[in-house]
Design a protein with these regions (language model features):
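Extracellular/periplasmic carbohydrate-active domains that bind, remodel
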Residues: 2-392
Length: 392
């Protein structure tokens, strides 16, 4: 007996309604859970309550932070959760305590660990770091400071439209994660703020950083050991210390860095442009298959630099040689101005010289004149127009 067409239509409609209901996200407003938008009342418990509800839900969840300023102490959002779709939709500002000592000895202010499928959309994170920077500048005994936003051992993370202001230490750290996308992120801190790296990536794969503007007192993006398949595109950096691979080789047994692409980036008034840096001591580390492409330098102190003799304070490494092996590094379409005469510097390991370095269509000037390139223990090729003249 044939099933009536109307019954089939009704059945399909019912299935669609059920699926739609399952897919519809549950929303928890932190204000409804006790958070106060006055910037003075501690709202940490309300945020943790929202997270507990979200993490226990089998449906997708939106944690909504309305307009206003919400004071948070250091907070840890831990997984695994029962769903893989939790979104923080932030219309307001999360504010760290004015007394930097409240969170200054915590590794992180806002920390996600063992989560999957977390999205942060919009919002401002105000780390209130200026007083701690002043403490450090005075030479007094100060806490080391907290990273503003940290992700550890987490997968499928998305961060978009987020602003991080005045972090005590690093602004954003991605550690031990896979498949992370950061888009339209803005980082802002004073050019003399200590150790305030914009985005730090280590022991992670499949990280993408797009369409972002970073102004800070340390590296705009720092790339640590164990990073692979990293893509950075359309990023403006300055002030800051540039985009740095390293420091590598701090530990004798260390994971390497490979498959990194940095393209369409602009450096303005930075200490470095494109930098690879390793400690001058033995290590199993490496950096290979690196592409730097389409970069503009505007009054940058060290536009292109490999430094394998990093030894801060001349402690723990004098008289030793870097064991980090650097190979297959390409600089393509790099142009602009250097604020120092040496615009290209390859200072590589005497034991493991840099190999397969390629310069292609590079033009860097110093005071509108020809700049200088220097090489030590570096080998490779040059193609197209290369100024300063290649020393490879």
């Amino acid at each position: 007996m044939a099933i009536p067409r109307s019954l089939i239509v009704l059945s399909l409609a019912f299935v669609f309604m059920i699926n739609s209901a399952l897919a519809t996200a549950v929303t928890y407003n932190v204000a409804s859970l006790g958070a106060k938008a006055n910037g003075k009342t501690d709202s940490t418990k309300a945020f943790l309550s929202a997270w507990a509800k979200a993490c226990a839900s089998v449906k997708p969840v939106v944690i909504y932070v309305p307009a206003g300023r919400f004071l948070l102490r250091n907070v840890v959002f831990s997984g695994p959760c029962k769903n893989n779709a939790i979104t923080f939709r932030i219309a307001g500002t999360l504010v760290a305590p004015s007394n930097y000592r409240v969170i200054g000895n915590a590794d992180n202010w806002i920390f996600f660990q063992h989560v999957n499928g977390v999205t942060i959309s919009g919002g401002i994170l105000d780390g209130k770091g200026t007083a701690l920077w002043a403490c450090k500048a005075s030479g007094k005994s100060c806490p080391s400071g907290a990273t503003t936003l940290g992700f550890s051992n987490s997968n499928n993370i998305k961060v978009s439209g987020l602003i991080s202001l005045n972090s005590q230490m690093f602004h954003i750290v991605i550690n031990g994660c896979h498949n992370v996308k950061m888009d339209g992120v803005r980082v802002s801190a004073s050019g003399n703020s200590p150790n305030t790296d914009g985005i730090h990536v280590q022991m992670s794969s499949g990280v993408t950083i797009l369409n972002s503007k970073i102004a800070t007192g340390d590296d705009c993006v720092s790339i640590g050991p164990g990073t692979s398949n990293l893509w950075i595109e359309n990023v403006a950096c300055g002030p800051g210390h540039g985009i740095s691979i390293g420091s590598l080789g701090k530990d004798q047994q260390e994971a390497g860095v490979q498959n990194v692409t940095v393209k369409t980036v602009t450096f303005t008034g930075t200490q470095n442009g494109l930098r690879i840096k390793s400690w001058g001591r033995p290590s199993t580390g490496f950096a290979r298959n690196i592409l730097f492409q389409h970069a503009v330098m505007i009054n940058v102190q060290n536009p292109i630099v490999i430094d394998q003799n990093y030894c801060p304070g001349k402690k723990g490494c004098p008289g030793q040689v870097s064991g980090v092996r650097i190979s297959d590094v390409t600089y393509q379409d790099i142009h602009g101005s250097s604020s120092t005469e040496v615009a290209v510097k390859f200072d590589c390991s005497s034991k493991y010289p840099c190999s397969k370095i390629r310069l292609e269509n590079v033009k860097l000037t110093y005071k509108n004149q020809v700049a200088v390139a220097t090489c030590s223990h570096a080998g490779g090729t040059a193609a197209g127009m290369v100024q300063p003249t290649s020393c490879l």
